[in-house]
């Protein structure tokens, strides 16, 4: 009899249901709500003693509520004698605060979150496309960071784009974009943003010939969509025939939907690590792919003590 059990909070129950469907097991029974003063309440409604528990809970908006749900659930499972607790965090919030720039008086919030997850008794963490790989080093427990690129690459291949070119929207994303370009066997372009003079707007230098090409911008997340929309504009101005964007995490905060609708971006393709808002679902230029099969396979391998890296060879 399998000891694996999968539970979820309120962050992304649809993804959790898709994952257990892939694993051919039922979704675990846990009640997660709030007390009248807004504090998180949780109760496990079935026996988990000796079980291999997986909690699927991205820490997306509302970030603090979803993070506290994860922490409180983990404590409940630990106190209920689960043999192992794995936090499956498809989107890891607070990941962008991972350093102190020039000794500024700021928190390293990614480290704070790592400490919180460890101290409540979580044994292992599974993430998808961490914003910065070094965050794995903030944990004193094993962290498996899997990639959304296979899902994105499969869809790009299915679209049968002509004269294709993968483009990194900034220098920081070159490694990710190069890996996608290599998988597809196509050219790589890079957008180098730089401010020539103080108080002047950024200038986008295009590295690579995009004239007449179908350009695909690749990034780990799309937040306000400002960078992608400006990049799409620069590519079109340099002669690109079409510009698409493929991003794993659809954060889509602030005026993101408005920015996308008013841009020259032909389409934004994302995964379901984060659920789309009603406005995002209604936007004809946004399409969502299912990452559940990849997450489910990683969960299965962890539970069976199999290699995770073998998934991406």
Curated annotation (Swiss-Prot):
It comes from Pseudomonas syringae pv. tomato (strain ATCC BAA-871 / DC3000). Binds 2 Mg(2+) ions per subunit. Its EC number is 2.7.6.1. D-ribose 5-phosphate binds at residues 195, 219, 223-227. GO terms for cellular component: cytoplasm; ribose phosphate diphosphokinase complex. Belongs to the ribose-phosphate pyrophosphokinase family. Class I subfamily. NCBIfam families: PRK01259.1, ribP_PPkin. This is Ribose-phosphate pyrophosphokinase. ATP binds at residues 37-39, 96-97. Mg(2+) 2 binds at residue 170. Its cofactor is Mg(2+).
């Amino acid at each position: 009899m399998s000891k694996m059990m999968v539970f979820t909070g309120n962050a992304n129950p649809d993804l959790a249901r898709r994952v257990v469907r892939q694993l051919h097991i039922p979704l675990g029974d846990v009640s997660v709500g709030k007390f009248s003063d807004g504090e998180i309440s949780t109760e496990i409604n079935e026996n988990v003693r000796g079980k291999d528990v997986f909690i699927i809970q991205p820490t997306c908006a509302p970030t603090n509520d979803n993070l506290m749900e994860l922490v409180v659930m983990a404590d409940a499972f630990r106190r209920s004698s689960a043999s192992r607790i794995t936090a499956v965090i498809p989107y890891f919030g607070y990941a962008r605060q991972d350093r102190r720039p020039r000794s500024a008086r700021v928190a390293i919030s990614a480290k704070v979150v790592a400490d919180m997850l460890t101290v409540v008794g979580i044994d292992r963490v599974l993430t998808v496309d961490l914003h910065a790989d070094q965050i794995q080093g903030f944990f004193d427990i094993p962290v498996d960071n899997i990639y959304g690129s296979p899902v994105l690459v499969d869809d790009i291949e299915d679209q049968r784009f002509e004269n294709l070119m993968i483009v990194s929207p900034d220098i920081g994303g070159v490694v990710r974009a190069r890996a996608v370009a290599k998988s597809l066997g196509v050219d790589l372009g890079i957008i180098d943003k730089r401010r020539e003079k103080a108080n002047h707007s950024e200038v986008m230098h295009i590295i690579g010939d995009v004239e007449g090409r179908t350009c695909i911008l690749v990034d780990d997340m799309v937040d306000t969509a400002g960078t992608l929309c400006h990049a799409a504009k620069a590519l079109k101005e340099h002669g690109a025939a079409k510009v698409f964007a493929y991003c794993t995490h659809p954060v889509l905060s602030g005026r993101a939907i408005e920015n996308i609708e008013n841009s020259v971006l032909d389409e934004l393709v994302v995964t379901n690590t984060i659920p789309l808002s009603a406005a995002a679902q209604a936007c004809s230029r946004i399409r969502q792919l299912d990452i559940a099969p990849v997450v489910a396979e990683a969960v299965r391998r962890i539970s069976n003590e199999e290699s995770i890296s073998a998934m991406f060879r």
